[in-house]
Amino acid sequence: MDENTAPDNFLTHSFNLKPGTDTWRFLQNQFEEAYKMKDVITHIPTRTQNRLHRYTPVPPADVMKNEPDTDFDLAQNQEWVRNIFAKWKKSPADSPEIIPLQIGAETVVCEKRHKYMDRCQDDEVCVCEMSQADAGQVMKILEIAEKDPAGWRKTTLQERHKIMYEAANRLGEMRGDLIGCMCAVTGKTVVEGDVEVSEGIDYARFYTTSMKQFAELPDVDIAPKGTILVISPWNFPCAIPIGGIVAGLAGGNTVILKPATVAAPVAWLFAKAFWDAGVPKEALQVVITDREALKVLTTAPAVKHIILTGGTDTAQNIARSNPATPLSAETGGKNAIILTASGDRDHAIMNIVASAFGNAGQKCSACSLLLVERSVYEDKNFQDKLKDAATSMKVGSVWNPGNVVGPMITNKNDKLLKALELEKGESWLVPPRFLDKHKYVLAPTVKWGVRPGNYSFRTELFGPMLSVVCIENLQQGIDLVNSLEYGLTSGLQSLDEGEQKLWKDLIMAGNLYINRGITGAIVNRQPFGGMKLSAFGGGVKAGGPNYCACFVNIADKPGSTTDYTQSYVKAYEQEFAHARDVNNLYGEQNAFRYLPLKNMVLRLFPGDNNEDAKMIALAARICHTPLSISFEPGDDRTAALASLGCPLKEEALAGFLKSMKNYERIRTCGADIPMEMYEEAARIDKYIATAKPVKDGRVELIHYIKEQSISFEYHRYGSILEVPPVE
């Protein structure tokens, strides 16, 4: 198409071309000028990345640049992969490595150890064994973290920034080993493991950089919270735990990392990068435990904040067992792509299969639902192409670098096995096929005719199965997606600008994607985190500008004279009012924006002062978040607060507890509130913002918004007609 239409191309003029005309001379001149360049144009490839070479360290910087992934098309990098396999693919003759338990600066080998078998070798080869802590050892780990004998909390942000950059460089040096460990222990393909290492490096460089904007605020004091517990998942065993520990360490906290047991050797490996870079072993401890000892960790008074990436039920259990400890959790997702009649079907299919089957469908952001407008749904050609795309993906052992889909982490996923049964009206476009003896490797599977309410429509599965639903129009698709309990990622495949705007305005999810895949969020480019039951905490995204502020205590300096009214207005206009794209990639827009909350309630207690209430009311109004104010009978605030324009309600605590479910978020003037409030909030999955209000708007206004990332691929096979506005 470009050849026939572009003004510089020969075919544009060839039909009416005559010698001696202006067009003839234009084309002749083009040719002659091009010919003159033949001896000066370089023949050296521009793609020169070579993973066989020693990693080039990156010095500390004030602006983070994302780490490049590996270019696997290059011969030298393919040789590098073969070297990884030679080292990490163990044989039955190899003795498994024994990983000790770390307690501060000491290590001990425990009798109780978890064995890690290579699922790509039919569980017949043991890769390593890792020591598990008992409850007594967990108590020692907690004591060390609380006392901070190495003085990590006394370090400056600049010192921590330098150390985190050094850790990032160490991670870059061990990229091959991290990938090999993920292949052997978790069954990740080389490509999927590679992007994880890049993401972990990005986190190490980004979070201390992002902390500087808060450290430079003139009228606030920032202090570490104390000990942060990071509980990380098996499906991203490298990037996500690195993100959690750096977020904690960046603020001067000591960190205890409890990785998913089935993926923990990866954490032991990358922890060495941080220790070698200068993080004291007393400040970063890695531990795996049994269920009983884990409860000691999650309920310990020494732990001041918990960072979790895992299942929604896990987050609920932790919150309900320890409701007063702040929890920041990225949890489940039942993620959908909507394809309308206005979508590019071929391009959509490419995005759909990559999103559904990458990492064997085990990403929390994976597409497990495809909602297709009827005219496309009933198109036999579309069905054939989708089937062909799914069945064309290479599936099998990760030790074959050509395989795109590898094994699942477990062969005992009861939810997935149940979804592999058909309900009434359903059929298989691509039937399920297990390709190995122990049923770890499931080929991409596509279920057709799934109806809203069916098991596979509403259940998060963590496997390479896509459920296809017929819809009548986009609005119906939006309504169905919004009816789900989750709101992590969501996608639209449509070239219609009106449909894009409607979907963007109405869909309830944290990360939105238009005309591209819905997985693979990149640090600072697409800050990541969901809504509804896909997130617990303050609605602040990992890999975004505000994440690290969650894990420090920020207070007004004594005697602060900041005019909070001016500060709130200024902060809103400069930071919160407008969407922005900090990367400005040509061809893909990545907008980051703040949304007001549906509603919010401020609960006042007799010890709270009215000035704090006025600050909260002003902040909510500036952020366009409707606020109600509730107070105890006998503590009448009507006269003092009537001018704020907020609904005022005098009610006993029991009545307030019953009404909490009606608000998206609860606000208080401090953390010293009745335990019943914490318990009820945990029971109904609500977040209480308990930080004492501060006068600086850049800090305070975070409590009254939620964050959303929108990634929009606006080029058409490399051609760009118009760059859309960021909104």
Stretch-by-stretch model annotation:
Residues M1:
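Conserved, mostly hydrophobic/aromatic
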Residues H114, V127-Q132, D148-R153, I337-T340, ...:
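Short, well-ordered beta-strand elements within core beta-sheets of diverse protein domains
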